[in-house]
A protein has these predicted regions:
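Function-determining sites in protein domains
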Residues: 1-247
Length: 247
């Protein structure tokens, strides 16, 4: 029902100076709200009754975040500020992406995962103990790295997947991946982006994880459970064997 929806659900699409934002139910802390950009009327539609609605809203900058990427919206009658994001944002370089989102201060690295084949079986690998400053240096030093224009036309040989947070804009456990052929890929801001940092840089990062971090391998077990003739109400999925391979 319409009256049970939040303002960000009712009035999700917001257009400001030709840029299309999509509001999400993530609060922007008052101390992160910058100067007011404009006041406007936002529109929403109840698809069940085909009724249309309008509401007043104020748009603000988010401190240290480019308005090309995101802004804050405050709806009339609502004291909270909400994130609204521009999914159509397309940076030209990795440096622009870093600066526009203040990634040095807003991006958090969580888990580092990979996969490898050993003795004919695929194994998932989890790395721990990575120095976050070293990771940043290895992956983000080339600020002139160009953004890929036609990402959908390329096939990437993925090497490492990094779980990242950008909580200021409402992202938790999002993917930032590194390919063996030298690309960084991410879906931050809701659309795929890729930057070419070069094969040498990618190999340097992979080598750092392999040689300087602790790695634990998990064997993928696709075997069928042995049939015993007895039914069970529990899960029949086979367990996953795990063992440490590097201290």
């Amino acid at each position: 029902r319409w009256d049970e929806k939040t303002n960000t659900e009712k009035f999700r699409e917001i257009t400001v100076n030709g840029k299309e934002y999509y509001a999400v139910n993530t609060y922007v802390a008052a101390d992160k709200v910058g100067k007011k950009v404009t006041k406007l009327t936002v529109l929403g539609k109840d698809v069940y009754t085909n009724s249309e609605y309008a509401a007043g809203a104020e748009i603000y900058e988010i401190k240290n975040i480019s308005s090309e990427c995101a802004a804050a919206v405050k709806y009339d009658g609502d004291e909270k500020y909400y994130v609204c994001r521009n999914a159509y944002y397309k940076p030209e370089t990795l440096g622009q992406f870093i600066n526009d989102l203040d990634l040095k201060n807003t991006l958090t690295f969580n888990e580092f995962n990979s996969a490898r084949e050993k003795n004919g079986k695929m194994r998932d690998v989890k790395y721990t103990g990575a120095d976050k400053e070293r990771v940043w240096e290895l992956l983000f030093s080339d600020t002139q790295a160009k953004a890929v224009k036609d990402i959908e036309t390329l096939n990437f040989e993925m090497a490492v997947d990094i779980s990242v947070d950008l909580k200021l804009l409402g992202y938790e456990n999002f993917s930032l991946s590194v390919s063996r052929d030298g690309y960084i890929l991410t879906n931050i801001l809701d659309t795929a982006k890729a930057f070419y940092i070069g094969r040498e840089a990618a190999e340097g990062f992979i080598s750092y994880l392999d040689n300087s971090c602790k790695a634990v391998e998990y064997e993928r077990d696709y075997s069928e459970p042995e049939y015993t003739g007895k039914e069970s109400s529990g899960s029949t999925a086979s367990g996953t064997a795990s063992y440490e391979v590097k201290q």
